[in-house]
From Swiss-Prot:
Entry binding sites for Zn(2+) 1: H93, D262, E298, E299, D343
Gene name, Swiss-Prot/TrEMBL: ape4
Protein biosynthesis is among the record's keywords: no
Organism of derivation: Schizosaccharomyces pombe (strain 972 / ATCC 24843)
Cofactors that this protein relies on: Zn(2+)
UniProt xrefs under InterPro entries: Peptidase_M18, Peptidase_M18_dom2
Function noted in UniProt: Aspartyl aminopeptidase that is able to remove aspartyl residue at N-terminus of angiotensin I. Also acts as a chaperone and efficiently suppressed the thermal aggregation of citrate synthase.
Cofactor note: Binds 2 Zn(2+) ions per subunit.
Annotated protein name in UniProt: Aspartyl aminopeptidase 1
Length: 473
């Protein structure tokens, strides 16, 4: 299905589906909610970590489980699977570099209402200046019966802005723009007025602007078709985002311009591939379990209850293996499994070509990229490359390779962490992109379909291919 020239209808449809997903997923909480809805629409059943699964899961069916509502694991059990057989896994993450409201966010200066924010992850922070910014996250509301319920909120309009200083007051701005993250990187949300002063006096909230709490309460009230009092908001986790929608760009719509490509791009492709792989009753002859974990907190190290270094994935795989009676079967399943760490990759930047290794440089719309690093910043090895090349050949999609220069630092992914924790064979890959960790990034519009088809082929062919690549007998 290799594509040449302009996009095919199916490639464009896949790219447009991604736009819908990323525009509806301003936070990990929204992403997980949308993933759950996608899985349920394809017959997946929800499982609670707090319940016993022994009587609930069985071969031939599909399930998903969430943790903290910001990480999710979906899996489909082949009808021929038995404890001791392997898992085919494509792991992604749901978070992106962003700005998060501080526990006490209320600020004001010279008649402006401001909010205090804390940086999350390694963003290119200067790209957040002079952008229309929205606000989204989860809000904890106390109900009349005393329960505290999470509501996802998205103020889907330009609400905040971090303005730059006029060049007349900073003549060096074009040659050496720099700023203090604490004092010169404070978003504006409005102007002080009599209404704001009155609400502050009535509410007495010293943590957040009362007008902000009222805005959140109104947003929740609209979704519930009832009235929520701002005083019932107990706490929240809110982050800023680019208010401009993701969209197609370029002369032939060959680009996608979007926030959060890293890593909702791969999260979208993996989830689509899992459900696509189930077509034509493919689980009937499947001897493995197909798994897509999407973790929170990758951008800050993955060390949390819902991050990739948590018990989440090992616990889920262990519970699936407990369908058998022998405790040793879990360890056997691990060594028979293969994990693909799917995280976006660096495409060639035409204005900075000297920063790239000449022979292993990916390009947009040329296929998914296998990432290699001798120092195990990426976990790819020759056995994994052989497997992915065969998977790509069966799917008739192109793949590329990426290696950093010897005089350049190298990023990493959840791949090495999961490989070390589980002992599973692991490979790192991702679709190529530009402006990684910017407030707004870009990638190729054809590469979404390439990745979905590649990942679906991996799920459908892993069991047969795994037996033919002999390493440890």
């Amino acid at each position: 299905m290799q594509l040449h020239g302009k996009m095919t209808a199916t490639a464009k449809s896949c790219a447009l589906d991604f736009l819908d997903f990323v525009n509806a997923s301003p936070t990990p909480y929204h992403a997980v909610q949308n993933l759950a809805e996608h899985y349920m629409s394809h017959g997946f059943q929800y499982l609670s970590e707090k319940s016993d699964w022994q009587s609930k899961i069985e071969p031939g069916n599909s399930y998903f489980v969430t943790r903290n509502k910001s990480s999710i694991i979906a899996f489909s059990i082949g009808k021929k699977w038995k404890p001791g057989n392997g898992f085919s896994i494509i792991a992604t993450h749901t978070d992106s570099p962003t700005l998060r409201l501080k526990p006490k966010s209320q600020k004001s200066a010279y008649g402006y209402l401001q909010v205090g924010v804390e940086k999350y992850g390694g963003g290119i922070w200067h790209t957040w200046f002079d952008r229309d910014l929205s606000l989204a996250g989860r809000v904890m509301v106390e109900e009349e019966d005393g329960r505290v319920i999470q509501y996802n909120v998205h103020i889907d309009r330009p609400l905040l802005r971090i303005p730059t200083l006029a060049i007349h007051l900073d003549p060096s701005a074009n040659s050496s723009f720099s700023f203090n993250m604490e004092t010169e990187f404070v978003p504006l949300i409005g102007l002080e007025n009599e209404l704001a002063k009155e609400e502050t006096s009535d509410n007495g909230d010293k943590y957040h602007h009362p007008v902000l709490l009222s805005l959140l309460a109104n947003e929740i009230s609209k979704s519930l078709e009832t009235t929520i009092d701002p005083s019932k908001i107990v706490d929240f986790e809110l982050i800023l985002g680019d208010a401009e929608k993701a969209r197609l760009g370029g002369i032939h719509e060959e680009f996608v311009f979007s926030p959060r490509l890293d890593n909702l791009g791969m999260t979208f492709c993996a989830s689509q591939a899992l459900t696509k792989s189930l077509e034509n009753n493919s689980l009937d002859n499947e001897s493995c379990v197909r798994v897509v974990p999407s973790f929170d907190h990758e951008e800050i190290g993955s060390v949390s209850a819902q991050g990739a270094e948590s018990t989440f994935l090992p616990a889920v795989l262990q519970r699936i293996c407990e369908l058998g009676k022998e405790s040793s079967l879990f360890s056997i399943s691990m060594v028979k499994s293969f994990l693909v760490s799917a995280d976006m990759a660096h495409a060639m930047h035409p204005n900075y070509s000297s920063r790239y290794e000449n022979s292993n440089t990916p390009f947009l719309n040329k296929g998914t990229v296998i990432k290699v690093n001798a120092n195990q910043r990426y976990t790819t090895n020759s056995a994994g490359i052989v497997l992915l090349k065969k998977v790509a050949q069966l799917a008739d999609v192109p793949i590329q390779s990426f290696v950093v220069r010897n005089d350049s630092p190298c990023g990493s992914t959840i791949g090495p962490k999961l490989a070390a924790m589980t002992g599973m064979r692991t490979l790192d890959l991702g679709n190529p992109m530009l402006s990684m960790h910017s407030c707004r990034e870009m990638c190729g519009s054809k590469d979404f379909e390439y990745a979905v088809v590649l990942f679906s082929s991996f799920f459908q062919n892993f069991a047969n291919l795994e037996e033919k690549i002999i390493i440890d007998e």
